[in-house]
Structures are given as structure tokens and as C-alpha cells.
Curated annotation (Swiss-Prot):
Induction: Part of the SigD-controlled yvyF-csrA operon and the SigA-controlled fliW-csrA operon. Expressed from the SigA operon at low levels during log phase, with a 5-fold increase as the culture transitions to stationary phase, peaking 1 hour later. Changing residue 36 to T/V: In sow-8 and sow-4; suppresses the motility loss and flagellar assembly defect of an fliW deletion. Binds FliW. Keywords: Cytoplasm, Repressor, RNA-binding, Translation regulation. The keyword tRNA processing does not apply. Homodimer. The beta-strands of each monomer intercalate to form a hydrophobic core while the alpha-helices form wings that extend away from the core. Two molecules of FliW interact with 1 homodimer. mRNA and FliW bind to different sites on CsrA. One of its GO terms (cellular component) is cytosol. Changing residue 6 to L/W: In sow-2 and sow28; suppresses the motility loss and flagellar assembly defect of an fliW deletion. Binds FliW. A translational regulator that binds mRNA to regulate translation initiation and/or mRNA stability. Usually binds in the 5'-UTR at or near the Shine-Dalgarno sequence preventing ribosome-binding, thus repressing translation. Represses expression of flagellin (hag) in a post-transcriptional fashion. Specifically binds to 2 sites in the 5'-UTR of hag mRNA in a cooperative fashion; the second site overlaps the Shine-Dalgarno sequence and prevents 30S ribosomal subunit binding. Mutation of either binding site abolishes CsrA regulation of hag expression. It comes from the Bacteria. Belongs to the CsrA/RsmA family. This is Translational regulator CsrA. Contacts FliW via its C-terminus (residues 49-58).
Amino acid sequence: MLVLSRKINEAIQIGADIEVKVIAVEGDQVKLGIDAPKHIDIHRKEIYLTIQEENNRAAALSSDVISALSSQKK
């Protein structure tokens, strides 16, 4: 893991298209501004993990439904 120190209004560049800028520091909270192309999904990690869990659950359900339908067809 790369660890960088930045002050307010300083940024890091990720590739050619993504900039992460420190907007504010208030107590133990850091506000970041992220400038990225619209096709790049940006989520808080806990939201991203929830999305992944839901996608996995939906995929498992889909395979169960397909199995049930194919067994009824026989």
C-alpha cells in the first residue's frame, strides 16, 4: 500500500484521468474531492462491499432459478 501525506487543497493523481483532492480536515474526518470520468464508479468501501454482496446473492439466486426451471422442463 502506498501511503501519502497531503495538506488541504493538495491532490494525488491516479493515472491520467483521476484526481483525488483533500477538501477539508475536521477533527477525525477528512473530506475528499474526486475528479474522474463518468464511466468510473466511485463508492465508499462499505457501499461497494454491500453492492458486491447483493450481486453475488442475485447471481446465486439466478442459478437456483435456472436449475429449478430446467428440472421442471424434464
